Amino acid sequence: RITSVLRLLETEEGRDRTETIRRKLALLRDIRSTIERTGGNCVFDDIELFELKFFALLAEELRPLASQGRLAELPELNGVVDLLDPEGNRLPHFFVYGAYSEELTTLRKQIKARKQAGADESQVQELYFRSVEIEDCIRERLSVELRKYHKALQQALDLMGWLDVVIAKAMQARDWGLTRPAITQDTASFR
């Protein structure tokens, strides 16, 4: 694969594609433990759900770039993105969106209206606690649904890490003028 990257680096378009991939890979964080947890029976918090959404968005941006350059075939993670981004904004943040539950949307509107009306704090607090319960149920449901993407997430993380190393090696070989050794029958030559 290093030779594939070296061939890409020979053209301006290939260099641009490789540089774009490198910039995107620089955003990659080590979320191995979070991805491992998708294989278990745990409930993710908002930070872990954000990590998974950000990772899936990044993988989806990289997938066509890596495929066009014939570097790697990343698994499709649109299902993860759709699950964690029900409004389809494709922004790298996570929030328990109102789109997950009409009841949650209604409660949030009631809380806001009562606060603006100067309602008794205990009434607002009761609504707030109910909204937190609904959010927790949504997090639990999302965590269960994410289990089916465990292998794809793991494969994408492994391939993205591998791709980062291969590109770095190819760029080092190019920058240092390294050549691939070849075994010959006749003579040996050194450059």
Region spans (language model):
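Conserved amphipathic alpha-helical "coupling/scaffold" segments
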Residues: 1-107
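Charged/polar positions within long, soluble alpha-helices
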Residues: 7, 11, 33-40, 61-68, ...
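Charged, alpha-helix-enriched surfaces in structured cytosolic catalytic cores
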Residues: 19-26, 47-50, 54-57, 99, ...
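Generic preference for flexible, low-structure residues
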Residues: 47, 65-68, 147, 169, ...
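Extended, charged alpha-helical coiled-coil/arm scaffolds that mediate oligomerization and mechanical coupling
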Residues: 76-164
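Conserved NTPase motor "head" modules and their coupling/switch loops across ABC/AAA+ ATPases, GTPases
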Residues: 158-191
